[in-house]
Design a protein with these regions (language model features):
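Post-signal/leader-peptide non-cytosolic segments of secretory proteins
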Residues: 20-100
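Classic N-terminal secretory signal peptides
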Residues: 1-21
Length: 101
């Protein structure tokens, strides 16, 4: 009986759909109007609060390059992460140099 209960529970747990994963996220230093843009294989959506989220697999590239390409289009960031790992303060400083060129 216990074995059947465990099997049924395991079947229910594995049958649940996985939540849609975010590909990347960023926080803009100077929030502006809400906007949405598709580039580098991701659908970026930024709210008026400066919080940006991206969905999609993205182009295969180092995260530092992806961040630089993002700030060229959207502006300086105070946070940038991909696949759940955030850039360090030093990495963010290097990334943000692309915005002032």
């Amino acid at each position: 009986m216990l074995l059947m209960t465990l099997i049924s529970t395991a079947a229910l747990i594995t049958a649940q759909p996985a939540p849609a994963a975010l590909g990347a996220a960023a926080v803009l230093a100077a929030p502006g109007e809400a906007r949405s843009e598709i580039f580098d294989g991701r659908n970026w959506t930024c709210g008026p609060d400066g919080v940006c989220v991206a969905r999609g697999p993205g182009v295969s590239q180092p995260v530092s390059r992806e961040c630089r390409r993002f700030v060229v289009r959207f502006g300086v960031v105070t946070r940038y992460e991909r696949d759940g790992a955030a850039l360090t303060v030093a990495q963010l400083a290097q990334c943000n140099t692309a915005a002032v060129r």
